[in-house]
Each structure stands twice: as structure tokens, then as C-alpha cells.
Design a protein with these regions (language model features):
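Hydrophobic ligand-binding cavity/cleft-lining segments
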Residues: 1-44, 129-138, 149-154
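Intrinsic-disorder/low-complexity, polar/charged segments enriched in Ser/Thr/Lys/Arg/Asp/Glu/Gln
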Residues: 3-7, 44, 57, 70, ...
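Short, hydrophobic/aromatic-rich segments at coil-to-beta transitions
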Residues: 39-46, 65-73
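Short acidic, glycine-rich loop/turn motifs
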Residues: 49-53, 75-77
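Short, cysteine-centered beta-strand-loop-beta hairpins and adjacent loop/turn segments enriched
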Residues: 52-59, 105-109
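Beta-strand/loop substructures that line and gate deep hydrophobic ligand-binding cavities in soluble
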Residues: 63-64, 72-132, 136, 141-143, ...
């Protein structure tokens, strides 16, 4: 499994950054390669994205969600990955968004993309675009404030 950890500081309150991140269907607006995210249920997402030039589809479950703190997920099929995004108040109106990903590169193209740092750079660029997206708006496009308790069997 490959691991990526990146963070970005955004000039919005924790609540605003967190609320925007719960709007999964907006991800294509700032995540390169993400074509579509559909929220099937409160805890299930259907993704369609281009990875290393190949279009892929998969479902992922939200395994834990605590408002203004964290959102964790794990893929169910397709590219094997899991991750967590956490939100940290630095000062009034400034939030650190930290993203941690673990993923299993599949074919040779994905392994090369991982080895060359392409995937890490894409994550950095996505976080930068998230910053531009939320700071230019100044407010979230929506919010889901529900909680998902971590399943102790995972």
C-alpha cells in the first residue's frame, strides 16, 4: 500500500471547510480526474474518475464522520484505497485540512504514477484547488452534519 499525507491551510472557519467537504458531488469542481461522485446513501458514494488515463468506477463507504473533525472512507471495489480527512482550527477563520490516503496501485501505469510522485502531486494540486474553491466562495455549497460511528470490526 502506498501512503500519502498532505495538508493545506484555508482561510475559512472549520465549519465551512468541513461542510464543503461533505458535498461529495462537488468534488469534480476541484479534483482533477474526478468525473462524477454520486451520493447513494448517507454512507455510500459512487465514483467515476480517470486514473492514469484510464476511466474507473468504484463505490466507497464512509466509515466514520464527526462534524468539524473528520471524515474517513474505504473503497469497496475498484481501485483499493482508504483515507481520512481531518479539520484543525488554527485560529479564527483559518483551518488546516489534512488528507491521509492509502492506496494499492493496480496495473503498471498506476505503479509508475505512484513511483514517480504523480499521485502525490495530484493530491497536492487537488487540495490547492479546494482552497481556491472554498476561499473564493467564502461559504460552503451545502452541508451534511450527521455522524457516522466507526465500525470497530474494520
Amino acid at each position: 500500500m502506498s501512503k500519502i499525507e498532505e495538508s493545506v491551510d484555508v482561510q475559512v472557519p472549520v465549519r465551512t471547510a468541513y461542510n464543503q467537504w461533505t458535498q461529495f458531488e462537488d468534488f469534480p469542481q476541484f479534483m482533477e480526474g474526478v468525473k462524477e461522485v454520486k451520493q447513494i446513501t448517507d454512507t455510500r458514494l459512487r465514483w467515476r474518475a480517470e486514473i492514469a488515463g484510464v476511466e474507473r468506477e468504484w463505490e466507497a463507504d464512509i466509515t466514520e464522520q464527526r462534524p468539524d473533525e473528520r471524515i474517513a472512507w474505504q473503497s469497496l471495489d475498484g481501485p483499493r484505497h482508504a483515507g481520512v480527512v481531518t479539520f484543525h482550527r488554527l485560529e479564527d477563520g483559518v483551518t488546516r485540512v489534512m488528507l491521509q490516503l492509502e492506496w494499492e496501485p493496480g496495473d503498471a501505469v498506476e505503479k509508475i504514477a505512484d513511483w514517480t510522485g504523480f499521485v502525490t502531486q495530484r493530491v497536492k494540486d487537488d487540495l490547492r484547488r479546494f482552497t481556491e474553491f472554498i476561499e473564493s466562495r467564502g461559504q460552503e455549497t451545502g452541508a451534511w452534519r450527521g455522524e457516522v460511528d466507526q465500525d470497530p470490526t474494520r
